[in-house]
Curated annotation (Swiss-Prot):
Keyword field contains Cytoplasm: yes
Localization (cell): Cytoplasm
Region (N-acetyltransferase) location: 250-463
Protein name in UniProt: Bifunctional protein GlmU
Stretch list, region Pyrophosphorylase: 1-228
Family designation: In the N-terminal section; belongs to the N-acetylglucosamine-1-phosphate uridyltransferase family.
Function: Catalyzes the last two sequential reactions in the de novo biosynthetic pathway for UDP-N-acetylglucosamine (UDP-GlcNAc). The C-terminal domain catalyzes the transfer of acetyl group from acetyl coenzyme A to glucosamine-1-phosphate (GlcN-1-P) to produce N-acetylglucosamine-1-phosphate (GlcNAc-1-P), which is converted into UDP-GlcNAc by the transfer of uridine 5-monophosphate (from uridine 5-triphosphate), a reaction catalyzed by the N-terminal domain.
Lineage, broadest ranks: Bacteria, Pseudomonadati, Pseudomonadota, Gammaproteobacteria, Chromatiales
Chief location: cytoplasm
GO MF annotation list: glucosamine-1-phosphate N-acetyltransferase activity; magnesium ion binding; UDP-N-acetylglucosamine diphosphorylase activity
Cofactor: Mg(2+)
Species of provenance: Alkalilimnicola ehrlichii (strain ATCC BAA-1101 / DSM 17681 / MLHE-1)
Binding-site positions, UDP-N-acetyl-alpha-D-glucosamine: 10-13, 24, 75, 80-81, 102-104, 138, 153, 168, 226, 332, 350, 365, 376
Binding site for Mg(2+): 104, 226
A Pfam family: Hexapep
């Protein structure tokens, strides 16, 4: 019978090296808090329970993860990793296997942890890694036959022990009953005056319990995050992983080192993503979608064959099939482009529906607007949707043509097939199939001089 699993996540550290007012574990990797990554991995192993030991910033950490069905355990004071596990262990049945994870080690894969649990096999298992520069890490000690005899922390290691490059990651699996007994025997007679969880390894050896060290293949999986330099390194590892996964799924990413996914992503085959693209929130791309360089997409859904040109920002927008967006376009929340619609360079939209085949090509603002089918909006056209108190809508019928430099003062309706003369300020509804021109008559004032060219005061007087 497979042994039941309980997971303990250590998340009580202060994170002083982050130099931040926020708890370390709330700093994001891939758009999600570090601890969120660890919890997702933990629950993927289908444990009986997950216990999170927290301390510094406890209320903020718990509030940010309120949707997770975890047991929160406060460690106060914080006296080391062994002391932290001791706070959670009483609630775990003796016949469970315990897996200890760390909230600031966000990149470990579920497959690695499954291998560690299998390697432990009723004994004690620890995850080890070979670091070319092991400074700061606890060293795994072995006897002449290669059997694990213990772990010594860097500060407590001798010169000979510091030359060992096999390091302890801190991730550990052990039988709950035995772990409880070992934790009761811990002392803090060490350089940091803390209760080290790693001391249970020597206890296991002394008690004749098999100790297995499972070496992780990719050191990046177990890289801890203690400062912002390490946070940035973890971010790039995470992003590279996501990029490679999507490339294997049929998405072309021109440079996986310049790709940022910070939320949920779904894409059809043959999508193409250029350099410097940032995807946030929930982004869904149909087949054959192309995203140009240095675009930001946040909570966006794009239909098959749609193309977004360089330096465009899309937020809370949707587009149908074969749309063209940008370059330098900004689509704000509530924007919906029907099939074949086009929003061109330096165009901003907000709460606007652009109908099938309609075009807003240049230097325009469409806010709180409804455009029908095959509408053409000339350069420099804006909807004046806000009167200082309320927002008002503009409706433009199928096939309408709006001349350049037009102001549509909402609420207003432009009829089907209507034409608006360039430079008009439209304040009343424009009828179907009619030309509407709303601008003052042109006049020329002869002899007019600019202010700097006007004669001095008193020039030509008899005084």
């Amino acid at each position: 019978m497979e042994q039941a699993l309980s997971i303990v996540v250590l998340a009580a550290g202060k994170g002083t090296r982050m130099r931040s007012r926020y708890p370390k574990l709330l700093h994001p990797v891939g758009g999600r808090p570090m601890l969120d990554h660890v919890l997702r991995t933990a629950f993927s192993l289908e444990p009986e329970a997950v216990h999170v030991v927290h301390g510094h910033g406890a209320e903020a950490v718990q509030a940010a993860h309120a949707d997770w069905p975890v047991r929160w355990v406060v460690q106060e004071p914080q006296l080391g990793t062994g002391h932290a596990v001791e706070q959670a262990i009483p609630a775990i049945p003796d016949d469970h296997q315990v897996l200890v994870l760390y909230g600031d080690v966000p990149l470990v894969r579920p497959e690695t942890l499954q291998a560690l649990l299998a390697e432990a096999d009723g004994g004690l298992g620890l995850l080890s890694v070979d670091f070319p520069d092991p400074t700061g890490y606890g060293r795994v000690l072995r006897d002449g036959h290669g059997a694990v005899t213990g772990v010594v922390e860097h500060k407590d290691a001798t010169a000979a022990q510091r030359r060992v490059t096999e390091c302890n990651t801190g991730l550990l699996a052990a039988p709950a009953g035995r772990l409880k007994a070992w934790l009761q025997r811990l002392d803090n007679d060490n350089a940091q005056a803390e209760y080290y969880l790693t001391d249970v390894i020597a206890m296991a050896v002394a008690d004749g319990v098999r100790v297995a060290a499972y070496p992780v293949a990719d050191p990046a999986e177990v890289q801890g995050v203690n400062d912002r330099v390490q946070l940035a390194a973890a971010e790039r590892v995470w992003q590279r992983r996501q990029a490679e996964d999507w490339m294997r799924a049929g998405v072309t990413i021109l440079d996986p080192d310049r790709f940022d996914l910070r939320g949920h992503f779904a894409a059809g085959e043959d999508c193409r993503i250029d350099v410097g693209v940032v995807l946030e929130g929930r982004v869904e791309l149909g087949a054959g979608v192309e995203i140009g360089p240095h675009c930001v997409l946040r909570d966006v859904a794009l239909g098959d064959g749609t193309r977004v040109e360089a330096h465009s920002v899309l937020d809370g927008a949707t587009a149908g099939r074969n749309c063209r967006i940008g370059p330098f376009a900004r689509l704000r929340p509530g924007t919906d482009l029907a099939d074949g619609a086009k929003v061109g360079n330096f165009v901003e939209t907000k709460a606007a529906r652009i109908g099938p085949g309609s075009k807003v090509n240049h230097l325009s603002y469409m806010g709180d607007a409804e455009l029908g089918r095959d509408v053409n909006v000339g350069a420099g056209t804006i909807t004046c949707n806000y009167d200082g108190h309320s927002k008002h809508r503009t409706e433009i019928g199928d096939g309408a043509f709006i001349g350049s430099g037009t102001q549509l003062v909402a609420p207003v309706r432009v009829g089907r097939g209507a034409t608006i003369g360039a430079g008009s300020t439209v304040t009343r509804d424009a009828p179907d199939e009619a030309l509407t021109v709303a601008r003052s008559a042109q006049r020329s004032i002869h002899g007019w001089r600019r202010p700097g060219q006007r004669p001095d005061r008193g020039e030509g007087s008899d005084a």
